[in-house]
A protein has these predicted regions:
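Absolute protein N-terminus
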Residues: 1-2
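Loop/turn positions that initiate beta-strands
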Residues: 5-6
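Short beta-strand-centered aromatic/proline hotspots
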Residues: 14-24
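Well-ordered beta-strand positions in beta-sheet-rich domains
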Residues: 15, 34, 47-49
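Short, solvent-exposed secondary-structure boundary/capping segments
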Residues: 24-36
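A short macromolecule-binding patch
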Residues: 38-52
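Charge/polar-rich, low-complexity and marginally structured segments
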Residues: 53-165
Length: 165
């Protein structure tokens, strides 16, 4: 259960703030409670109403500073699984983005970065698909880490690099 003014992760929308919890009558199910949320970093005019018993879209509390620092410190030790089949790799990436689990997102980013370095060494570039997945994962990581660590979103990547170097 979440409370008013909590910051949460809501699906792939990233960080949202619960601006209210309301009850409304619903023709089909009677009286029902809803979280009223607003994205923190994207369109601030967007307001979303979600049933408090929502099971369809992933929602969770933000990580703590301690949990984030632990994830950052563990980045050098992450084992990267290479998936050779493009379709399987794409499905895996979609699953990771949908889960919004920071440990998996950092693995995805690290894996794509390694793949990018390998390709650059032979004069090739990342595919548009991999670039898009990397951007989506970085957006989720950057926004959650920025909110919890109270730093600007654009400073998150350098913050991470400073702490793993």
């Amino acid at each position: 259960m979440f409370n008013k003014n909590d910051y949460i992760i809501y699906g792939s929308m990233s960080v949202c703030k619960i601006i209210d919890i309301i009850e409304e009558d619903n023709v089909y199910v009677g009286r029902k409670s809803y979280y009223v949320i607003r994205p923190v970093y994207s369109d601030k005019n967007t307001i979303i109403k979600i049933p408090t018993d929502n099971k369809k879209v992933f929602m969770r509390h933000l990580l703590s500073q301690k949990e984030i620092m632990s994830i950052i410190e563990n980045i050098p030790n992450l084992e990267i699984i290479k998936i050779e089949n493009d379709k399987e790799r794409s499905m895996h990436y979609k699953s990771v983005i949908k889960s919004s689990i920071c440990e998996e997102l950092t693995e995805l980013i690290k894996g794509i970065n390694i793949n990018e370095q390998d390709k650059l060494s032979i004069g090739k570039k990342l595919s548009k698909t991999e670039e898009d997945f990397k951007k989506a994962a970085e957006k989720l990581i950057d926004e959650e880490f920025a909110t919890v660590l109270n730093i600007p979103v654009q400073d998150v990547q350098s913050f991470i690099l400073d702490h793993i170097s």
